[in-house]
């Protein structure tokens, strides 16, 4: 096979596969070698694109869990091709981005083919900035910055100052350094190791959480309802009794409110019990001027009906948001018939205390949550429905929740239909409240905090310009 350094195609495939293993699994242990291989291909746009293709196809392989889609009205013969097409489209999008980045790299090199460190730094900064911009778009889930967790919490501590974009930039620089060491057969590796150790030491020191104001005890309901069965007549009949049971369990746990996951309450839901045993904070659906929205709703014992707190802003393409296509072409693409986005702000300034909300996919938008924290959010809530996807997506989701906790210095309560239901402390430590796929109610005691992190201040200063 020869020396790996002389095999660009092999390096592209191997690097992409290593990168794909990083999010939620191997972290920097596989990402840094993957980035070193990418730097070795930086002047080969097609090979760099191949790196991106394989990286995203492997890291996003959970998308194949969409199949079968027959419950959404799609013919059985078309279900697998549609799931594969969605999966491949994500890989192709990543390949195009890597192609553009490689073309930019060609413009940055010297005429003699060598590299200034300033050019390397510029390319790393462009990558980090691109991840920050993309995380607010509907076409991004997890990148190099988010791949640090759950494996390397000390390094992720730097996210308290730099955010996910800064973590991505640092890893790009270390990847370049690792490639230089490889080229030189390991000579002059001291500076590389020292920078790595210093970053980990600084990150570990930064993990100290802001001081807590008071504790908040909340219940978390994980109903574990398979999405493919959720809208069946039998499940609809059983829903109200299941919710009533969860509310009674929450009352026995002496919590201030019960939190239920994304999409739990149907449109125009009314409680059977009057009054409710405890307040209910739940995902659900509502209509606003003829537009359907996925929302977080609050039902209180002393008030009739439900109060909308925040609407989902960042919608999943096709799964939630549908383009204006003829009705026959949208069949089988969305279980909810197409949603409209709400306001971009994630800040909720109501009972029980000011907090910020990320509904499912929105957990990848760190800037929005940092901005909400700067507006006064004292804790973060994320609700989701990750069924029917496999456990890999839950691990990636929880890794992003850890990163958001570290960036903002806030405790994060995650409540999901089939998991992960967990409490993430402001220092990124995770307390699993319930096992995946388990129908149960658990209590979580989180801490309310007000002191801002450097990253939240930076995001607020930038957004206020």
UniProtKB/Swiss-Prot annotation:
One of its GO terms (molecular function) is N-acyltransferase activity. Pfam families: CN_hydrolase. Keywords: Acyltransferase, Cell inner membrane, Cell membrane, Membrane, Transferase, Transmembrane, Transmembrane helix. Its main location: membrane. It is an enzyme of class 2 (transferase). It is a multi-pass membrane protein. This is Apolipoprotein N-acyltransferase. It comes from Parasynechococcus marenigrum (strain WH8102). The lineage of its organism: Bacteria, Bacillati, Cyanobacteriota, Cyanophyceae, Synechococcales.
């Amino acid at each position: 096979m020869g020396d790996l350094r002389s095999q660009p195609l092999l390096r592209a495939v191997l690097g992409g596969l290593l990168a794909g293993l990083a999010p939620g699994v191997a972290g920097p242990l596989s990402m840094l070698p993957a980035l070193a291989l990418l730097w070795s291909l930086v002047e080969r746009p097609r090979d760099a694109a191949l790196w991106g293709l394989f990286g995203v196809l492997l890291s996003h392989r959970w998308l194949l869990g969409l199949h079968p889609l027959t419950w959404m009205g799609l013919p059985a013969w078309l279900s697998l091709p549609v799931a594969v097409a969605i999966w491949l489209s994500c890989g192709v999008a990543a390949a195009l981005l890597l192609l553009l980045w490689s073309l930019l790299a060609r413009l940055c090199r010297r005429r003699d083919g060598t590299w200034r460190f300033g050019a390397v730094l510029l390319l790393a900064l462009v990558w980090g900035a691109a991840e920050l911009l993309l995380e607010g778009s509907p076409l991004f889930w997890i990148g190099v910055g988010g791949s640090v967790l759950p494996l390397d919490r000390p390094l992720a501590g730097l996210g308290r100052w730099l955010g996910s974009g800064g973590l991505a930039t640092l890893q790009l620089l270390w990847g370049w350094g690792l490639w230089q060491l490889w080229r030189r057969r390991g000579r002059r590796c001291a500076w590389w190791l020292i920078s790595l150790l210093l970053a980990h030491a600084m990150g570990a020191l930064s993990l100290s959480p802001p001081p807590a104001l008071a504790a908040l005890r909340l219940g978390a309901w994980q109903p574990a309802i398979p999405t493919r069965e959720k809208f069946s007549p039998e499940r609809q009949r059983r829903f109200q009794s299941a919710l009533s049971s969860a509310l009674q369990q929450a009352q026995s746990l002496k919590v201030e409110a019960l939190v239920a996951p994304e999409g739990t309450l149907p449109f125009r839901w009314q409680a059977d019990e009057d009054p409710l045993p405890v307040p209910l904070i739940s995902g659900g659906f509502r209509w606003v001027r003829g537009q359907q929205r996925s929302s977080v709703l609050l039902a209180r014992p002393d008030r009739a009906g439900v109060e909308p707190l925040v609407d989902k802003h960042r919608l999943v393409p096709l799964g939630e948001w549908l383009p204006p296509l003829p009705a026959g072409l949208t069949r089988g693409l969305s279980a909810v018939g197409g949603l409209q986005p709400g306001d971009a702000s994630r800040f909720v300034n109501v009972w029980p205390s000011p907090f910020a909300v990320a509904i499912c996919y929105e957990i990848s938008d760190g800037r929005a949550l940092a901005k909400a924290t700067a507006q006064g959010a004292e804790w973060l809530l994320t609700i989701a429905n990750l069924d029917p996807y496999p456990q890999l997506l839950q691990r990636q989701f929880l890794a992003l929740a850890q990163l958001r906790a570290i960036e903002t210095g806030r405790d994060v309560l995650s409540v999901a239909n089939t998991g992960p239901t967990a409490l993430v402390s402001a220092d990124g430590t995770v307390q699993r409240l319930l096992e995946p796929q388990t129908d149960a109610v658990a209590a979580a005691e989180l801490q309310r905090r007000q002191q801002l992190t450097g990253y939240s201040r930076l995001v607020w200063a930038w957004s206020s310009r």
